[in-house]
């Protein structure tokens, strides 16, 4: 009888441990929100825990614009082509990072914008801060009007300074127009 009790106890403990580990794997392995698509260099759409799609604008940074309309895609205007070329590079880099992170991100939502998008610091499961990478590689600029709402303000400024000093990405392009200036001048 004692042998039977030990055997049942062993299997009961083993079952509890296995079920517990399966639950932990689900929580750890699939943590974060699923990225449905990368809209551009500073905007993604994620599916939250309830299955709802949420548009997320990256906090603290502004990436170059991408062409949205056929007219923009066919534009021969040099400022358009320049902006859109850098915009596509930023978008592709975000797509690459998201794929490396298993199509999941962790959001630190800091605000909502006038378009109803959530504004957030976006990190991969391994902790990689996407905005920091974009800035370090010269694929975005710090968006100064909103830096005070940015919990990682110091990291943002350091990453941008690093790219600027090394003349990486947009910092190497003397014809590049800041995204906010481009929108004000050309997107009316």
Per-region residue spans from a language model:
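Electropositive
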Residues: 26-139, 143
């Amino acid at each position: 009888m004692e042998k039977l009790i030990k055997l049942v106890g062993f299997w009961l403990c083993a079952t509890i441990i296995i079920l517990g580990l399966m639950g932990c794997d689900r929580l750890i392995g699939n943590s974060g929100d699923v990225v449905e698509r990368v809209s551009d260099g500073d905007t993604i759409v994620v599916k939250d825990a309830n299955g709802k799609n949420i548009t997320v604008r990256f906090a603290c940074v502004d990436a170059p614009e991408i062409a949205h309309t056929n007219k923009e895609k066919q534009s021969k205007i040099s400022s358009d082509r320049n902006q859109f070329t850098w915009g596509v590079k930023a978008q592709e880099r975000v797509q690459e990072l998201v794929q490396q992170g298993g199509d999941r991100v962790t959001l630190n939502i800091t605000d909502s914008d006038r378009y109803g998008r959530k504004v957030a610091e976006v990190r991969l499961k391994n902790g990689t801060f996407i905005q920091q990478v974009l800035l370090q590689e010269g694929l975005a600029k710090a968006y100064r009007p909103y830096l005070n709402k940015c919990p990682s303000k110091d990291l943002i400024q350091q990453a941008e300074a690093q790219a600027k000093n090394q003349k990486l990405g947009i910092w190497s392009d003397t014809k590049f127009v800041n995204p906010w200036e481009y929108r004000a001048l050309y997107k009316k």
